[in-house]
Amino acid sequence: MTQLAIGKPAPLGAHYDGQGVNFTLFSAHAERVELCVFDANGHEHRYDLPGHSGDIWHGYLPDARPGLRYGYRVHGPWQPAEGHRFNPAKLLIDPCARQIDGEFKDNPLLYAGHNEPDYRDNAAIAPKCVVVVDHYDWEDDAPPRTPWGSTIIYEAHVKGLTYLHPEIPVEIRGTYKALGHPVMINYLKQLGITALELLPVAQFASEPRLQRMGLSNYWGYNPVAMFALHPAYACSPETALHEFRDAIKALHKAGIEVILDIVLNHSAELDLDGPLFSLRGIDNRSYYWIREDGDYHNWTGCGNTLNLSHPAVVDYASACLRYWVETCHVDGFRFDLAAVMGRTPEFRQDAPLFTAIQNCPVLSQVKLIAEPWDIAPGGYQVGNFPPLFAEWNDHFRDAARRFWLHYDLPLGAFAGRFAASSDVFKRNGRLPSAAINLVTAHDGFTLRDCVCFNHKHNEANGEENRDGTNNNYSNNHGKEGLGGTLDLVERRRDSIHALLTTLLLSQGTPMLLAGDEHGHSQHGNNNAYCQDNQLTWLDWSQASSGLTAFTAALIHLRKRIPALVENRWWEEGDGNVRWLNRYAQPLSTDEWQNGPKQLQILLSDRFLIAINATLEVTEIVLPAGEWHAIPPFAGEDNPVITAVWQGPAHGLCVFQR
């Protein structure tokens, strides 16, 4: 039987060098680590890792080849009160594995025990890691490096984006390969998108609770192997990495960046009653934030929280991010519940992971976007991330909805959000692009549902409609649900146009939710994380071509306005912006706070957004000059010069002179 050589303590994971495979695993509290390899018949061969350098266990298996399936058994104390839950009866996933073979089913053997260990062996049913080859011909691929000021983000789900697309071959719909199909790329280009932001693509598992209800985790925010691609999005699990790289290479050739939504805040092992897949059995005490009683700090709402202040966990997270950039050429990350990244346990801008990213020559050069909160005390950190990070701007989301759908936001507050929320983000040398402006995202109502539903309708999620937020700032315009009279449909359309215009012509970085540009509805479900069906898949056959054209025209208009693309804070008198009332005069203090919802925003001295957010048709006197409405508010031919705009109720128009 082949013996393991000592091997090397770096890099983490399993790496083939042409002659064999080097295996490394971190565990500060293990007493012994066994590498378990499986032949084609499923027979297991165990080897003690002979190398032990600091807290890294390592060994080298000569003659091992790519395709080898493996896992670990980690020996150590079972002391739950101290945070130790070692159980060598359970086969564990390598945290740095790049491919997984098998499914994460709800099986009693995949649990380690709560107070007492479960010593039933689970190797027969446990998922296995697979050694992969890193080689790929990137040809002349280069990152687009779109300037922040020119960036338009499109948030999409790999499967949901293309699964029902009639012009994409059936056999690749809903896959990584479909992302790089010419039909999809041409659509994104025509729309004006510069960055495709994908919901999680790292291997994830469906929560046991969902499996028991016949549901699955659709969004993917339940990670189990952060270096491995989710195989369900591949035409073949064995070619997932190749397919993903092909898609990125094709998108890059079209000038489109790829941003990954990544989950570094918790794992699919959930709470102490959850399954045992990897980290809990490798070194529970190091990987997670542990309370004094041995339970987890649940700052994520998912049962556990990764301890991203521990040096080894910082190294793990940093290596993961570098892997996606260096090996897959991704252009950036959106970090889920990113306040966890800064916990020490209190939130700090100089937290270890932030510092590691700042000092990394690779990670400091890509786009970094934070979801700037978690659910723990002090978890709301909007505006407080380090300068390299942009942040989801929920202030903008709520303000846009309140202004156009609830009619209860003063002009001053609206203008502040329109101007990249400078009161929040203009600090520490940050630029307006730090504000990621959004009206909708994957969680919450779609744009169409914002104007069709006053209340969430999440019954299909199996929680009796308790899940999902109740603070939607939506307006059904008089009737709950889709459909209605022609007048109702037109009023809803006008509200959608107003919200899209506010999003795409405001200062900051706009993010558009995939499907909003053609009227996708989730029928009032504002938490469709477990709906892998036609509720969430984009139905391209029902897409509104008129709304898509309207959205594309707005995006292309944005790119023509220097005040929006130059990424500089607006200052009084700099020619970037002037705020005027309905008579084309500067607003008084009283008008800002208590005046009617009528406003003119003059950008770059030649583009004018005229707003009438009142209930009545209102005459708006435009500033001096020859103004004409421009697409998408008027045709390009035979522009009509006007000095006064008859603003419809809850309407707006864009002019140029």
Swiss-Prot record:
Region (Disordered): 460-479
SUPFAM superfamilies associated with the record: (Trans)glycosidases, E set domains
Enzyme's top EC category: hydrolase
Keyword Transmembrane: no
Name the record gives this protein: Glycogen debranching enzyme
E.C. numbers: 3.2.1.196
Family label: Belongs to the glycosyl hydrolase 13 family.
Record GO biological process: glycogen catabolic process
PANTHER family tied to this protein: GLYCOGEN DEBRANCHING ENZYME
Keyword entries, A-Z: Carbohydrate metabolism, Glycogen metabolism, Glycosidase, Hydrolase
Active site residues of this protein: 336 (nucleophile), 371 (proton donor)
One Pfam family named in its UniProt record: GlgX_C
MF terms (GO), sorted A to Z: glycogen debranching enzyme activity; hydrolase activity, hydrolyzing O-glycosyl compounds
UniProt catalytic activity: Hydrolysis of (1->6)-alpha-D-glucosidic linkages to branches with degrees of polymerization of three or four glucose residues in limit dextrin
Involved pathway(s): Glycan degradation; glycogen degradation
